[in-house]
Curated annotation (Swiss-Prot):
Region of interest (Disordered), ranges: 1-22
Subunit details: Monomer.
Organism of origin: Streptomyces coelicolor (strain ATCC BAA-471 / A3(2) / M145)
Keywords: Aminoacyl-tRNA synthetase, ATP-binding, Coiled coil, Cytoplasm, Ligase, Nucleotide-binding, Protein biosynthesis
Position of sequence motif 'HIGH' region: 57-67
Family: Belongs to the class-I aminoacyl-tRNA synthetase family. ValS type 1 subfamily.
Recorded GO MF terms: aminoacyl-tRNA deacylase activity; ATP binding; valine-tRNA ligase activity
Cysteines paired by S-S bonds: none
Motif ('KMSKS' region): 531-535
Official protein name in the record: Valine--tRNA ligase
HAMAP family with a match to the protein in the record: Val_tRNA_synth_type1
Claim: Ligase is one of the keywords in the record: yes
Enzyme class: ligase
Reactions catalysed: tRNA(Val) + L-valine + ATP = L-valyl-tRNA(Val) + AMP + diphosphate
Length: 874
């Protein structure tokens, strides 16, 4: 029915321990896989390639749940493709994480009472490399614990010699093509880290600020502006108003006095100004605000910096040497003394950027930096998606992608750090500027020096899909494995990393995008949907859950929550539930082996099979097709759910249970069912393997005697279906489910046997009577049988004799009491929900709780009423 890829093997061992203990097997299995080279990729292979790069984790850290989530998805994809016969490369590596790594090492130096300046640049960089060699192995160890099937021999680091050559090469090409330039512009500046930082390193949060309105000018020619940053007024070079604002037309083009200074500044008309906001007039500080800088460029305004790199006021009279916050208060006080405060401080909540590393408030600062001219690069990145060369999953994320690449500003790529790829530009004594490519000798002689800045980390990670394959050399690996098949990453870095890879890949690789597909996932959150944060106290170390429940349990939990582009809540209870699933697989396979399940020989002809056998094989092939379709659409949650319910419900809870009487009876039917059970388990374990690799490896090799499920063949849908068998077993399931529900309603113990008469004459269900009786604990009816309850289900009648088993009068009394309680609960809930005054004051969660009580009361009333109707008269 489905192919088993293994050649005939020696009879497998049927011995499995009574319990599955992940800690005893996971580490050994992983090292065995690595030693046998299963995860390595051969560039000379004639197999079709399948390539995925790991989003390189920062060398500074350890894997968090977000990494574990992402790695689980990538691992599932690559394991499946390997089983499908692809030459599969999952490219591992780490990012040098410039500012983060430098901060970590600087803190270590601080404990020794030293700074990086005490060491000097060269010695400090050596110290960082030493730290990297001592700390970098932590992430690799965690990846092994998780089961990542990466090609370890190809592991890369963004500061490796080969990757450094790639960085220098593309910088030189972009520079020569006039796509890299140096200019003075506004950047995000961290006064603590003393560097420009990228947009992604800025965290915005609402801060409680104070809005102050102040009067500029003298006499009849005054204008009022409002600001939360009074300290920057020392650098104002204009006041801007909207050109159509009648209130200020008489002032446009005139000079007005700038308070606290000896300067006068012009009033300019600019359409950027919103005449409806505040007074309709805004102060313009081109050196300390990105929007003001743009206004300044349009009107030829000078840019006056009033703060140094530490955000301290520079040469401006009495405020010189004051921190920006100290100066803010001092300037407001000075303005008040001159009678220029029109409105005192008012509370004002506004979004303020903070450095993601040190949480310091970002200072927009005019600075000479290196930039990438992104216009043509961004257009190519947008067109690649528009033209269908690259697909984004889920498709609705395409709009966000276009919104960004179509409105992209030039990218500041220089950082005032020591750790990173140093900018390959030299300056000469006469103002010469020379960009040096790989293999070229830099200028020498008196007065020549290299730019002291390093490149933004995202610059080198933007080359990751091809630099890891040996570019700029035309290697066999580059020819075989570029472009990547898919990029799996979070939607949060769609703009910052994904788009940069698109721009650089298309530019460096002659218009070939770095990947065919971008599969975006959401963020991992706690079980209440709250963002995981140290400040919230809800951060989970994935190693803790792997130690407690096993790696498979964590992986399966993460995969079951992975809907494309949607955030993933996760709680420990869910991981424990996945561990229960692993135990269920283990116990069911152990039972099957103990009862002779086998994969030896071909499957018997369908004519020799029972309807139960044909049903499970029909369902198996449907699930194979279903899982394949979900994989192709990156629907990890749906494929995991499909496998969970098929394995647990259909195979273990129904097929195995329905087949027990067949096994006990022996004979040809039992032998056929043993072979069918072996086939179903073989295929199910192979289907489950990409998501839960460890437990499936142990069980599959024990069941089949095969070398490893890692290199087994991925199951294919044979096309076998039996709709009749599926309908028949669905009817059996309905009968069993309904009688079980009745037994539970009547308070019968699960193991309590009850006399019963099954009217199955002429029904296809007659063949299942033994199994039905065994599963429902039904005895033969006997001579004294009295039908006290009759259940018609799906054309079958089940009569039960509950005489002496249930005190019907007492049971009716108990149910009547429960019904009265449920009706009272319903009345109370309805009364509260009908009270408008209560609803107006009650918190939403209280109202929701009462609605839940009402729904529960309705369910109880329906259930108890049905039980009373079925209960025989005493």
């Amino acid at each position: 029915m489905t192919e088993n890829s293994q050649q005939p093997q020696p009879a497998p061992s049927t011995e499995l321990p009574t319990q599955y203990t992940p800690a005893e097997v996971e580490g050994q299995l992983y090292e065995r896989w690595v030693e046998r080279g299963y995860f390595e990729a051969d560039a000379k292979s004639d197999k079709p390639p399948y390539t995925v790069v790991i989003p390189p984790p920062n060398v500074t850290g350890s894997l968090h749940l977000g990494h574990a989530f992402e790695h689980t998805l990538i691992d599932a994809l690559t394991r499946r493709k390997r089983m499908q016969g692809y030459e599969t490369l999952w490219q591992p590596g780490m990012d040098h994480a410039g500012i983060a790594t430098q901060n970590v090492v600087e803190r270590e130096l601080g404990k020794e009472g030293k700074s990086r300046h005490d060491l000097g640049r060269e010695a400090f960089v050596e110290r960082v490399w030493q730290w990297k060699s001592e700390s970098g192995g932590q992430i690799s160890g965690q990846m092994r614990r998780l089961g990542d099937a990466v090609a370890w021999s190809r592991e890369r680091f963004t500061m490796d010699e080969g990757l450094s050559q790639a960085v220098q090469t593309i910088f030189k090409r972009l520079y020569d093509d006039e796509l890299i330039y140096r200019a003075e512009r506004i950047i995000n500046w961290c006064p603590r880290c003393l560097t420009a930082i990228s947009d992604i390193e800025v965290e915005y949060q609402d801060d409680d600020g104070e809005l102050v309105s102040m009067k500029y000018g003298e006499g009849d020619e005054t204008i009022v502006v409002a600001t939360t940053r009074a300290e920057t007024m020392l650098g104002d070079t204009a006041v801007a108003v909207h050109p159509e604002d009648e209130r200020y037309k008489h002032l446009v083009g005139k000079l007005i006095k700038l308070p606290l200074t000896d300067r006068s500044i012009p009033v300019v008309a600019d359409e950027h100004v919103d005449p409806e906001f505040g007074t309709g007039a805004v102060k313009v500080t081109p050196a300390h605000d990105p929007n003001d800088f743009e206004i300044g460029q349009r009107h030829g305004l000078p840019a006056i910096a009033v703060m140094d790199e530490h955000a301290v006021i520079t040469a401006h009279g009495p405020f010189q040497g004051q921190d920006r916050l100290e100066a803010r208060s001092a300037i407001v006080a000075a303005l008040r003394a001159e009678g220029r405060i029109v409105a005192e401080k008012r509370p004002y909540v506004h979004s303020v950027g903070h450095c993601s590393r040190c949480k310091t408030t970002i200072e927009p600062r005019l600075s000479m930096q290196w930039w990438v001219k992104v216009g043509p690069l961004a257009k190519a990145a947008g067109d690649a998606v528009r033209d269908g060369k690259v697909k984004i999953h889920p498709q609705e994320m395409e709009k966000r992608y276009f919104d960004w690449v179509d409105n992209l500003h030039d990218w500041c790529i220089s950082r005032q750090l020591w750790w990173g790829h140093r900018i390959p530009v030299w300056y000469g004594p006469e103002g010469e500027v020379v960009c040096v490519g790989p293999g070229e000798e830099p200028p020498s002689g008196e007065g020549w020096y290299q730019d002291s800045d390093v490149l933004d980390t995202w610059f080198s990670s933007g080359l990751w899909p091809f630099s890891t394959l040996g570019w700029p050399e035309q290697t066999e690996s580059l020819a075989k494995f570029y472009p990547n098949s898919v990029l799996v990453t979070g939607y949060d870095i769609l703009f910052f990393w994904v788009a940069r890879m698109m721009m650089f890949g298309l530019y460096a690789m002659d218009g070939t995008p770095p990947f065919h597909t971008i599969a975006l996932h959401g963020m991992v959150r706690d079980q209440n949907g709250k963002k995981m944060s140290k400040s919230f106290g809800n951060v989970v170390n994935p190693l803790d859950w792997m130690d407690k429940y096993g790696s498979d349990a964590l992986r399966f939990t993460l995969a079951r929550g992975a809907n494309p582009g949607v955030d993933v809540p996760i709680g420990e209870d869910w991981v424990q539930g996945s561990r229960n699933f692993a135990n269920k697989i283990w116990n069911a396979t152990r039972f099957a082996l103990m009862n002779g399940a086998t994969v030896e020989g071909p499957l018997p002809d369908a004519s020799r099979m029972s309807s139960t056998d044909r049903w499970i094989l029909s369902r198996l092939n449907s699930v194979v097709a279903e899982v394949d379709a979900y994989y192709e659409d990156y629907q990890f949650a749906k494929l995991s759910d499909a496998l969970f319910h098929f394995a647990w419900d259909e195979v273990f809870d129904w097929y195995v249970e329905l087949s027990k009487t067949t096994f006990q009876a022996g004979g040809e039917a039992a032998e056929v069912s043993k072979r069918v059970l072996g086939e179903v388990l073989d295929v199910t374990l192979r289907l489950l393997h990409p998501v839960v690799p460890f437990v499936t490896e142990t069980l599959w090799t024990t069941l089949t005697g095969g070398e490893s499920v890692v290199i087994a063949e991925w199951p294919t849908d044979s096309g076998f279906r039996d709709a009749g068998a599926e309908r028949e077993i669905e009817t059996v399931q309905s009968v069993i489910t309904e009688v079980r529900r009745f037994r539970a309603d009547q308070g019968l113990q699960p193991g309590q046997r009850v006399p019963a008469r099954l009217t199955l004459a002429g029904s296809a269900l007659a063949a299942h009577e033994a199994a039905v009786r065994q599963l429902l604990r039904l005895q033969p009816e006997g001579d004294a049988f009295t039908a006290t309850a009759t259940l018609p289900v799906a054309g079958v009648e089940v009569a039960l004799d509950l005489s002496g088993v249930i005190d019907f009068a007492a049971e009716r009394k108990r149910l009547a009491k429960d019904l009265a309680a449920a009706e009272k609960e319903k009345a109370q809930a309805n009364a509260k929900l009908g009270n408008e005054a209560f609803l107006a004051k009650a918190p939403d969660q209280v109202v929701d709780k009462i609605r839940g009580r009402l729904a529960k009361a309705d369910e109880d009333i329906t259930r108890i009423t049905a039980q009373l109707e079925k209960l025989p008269e005493a």
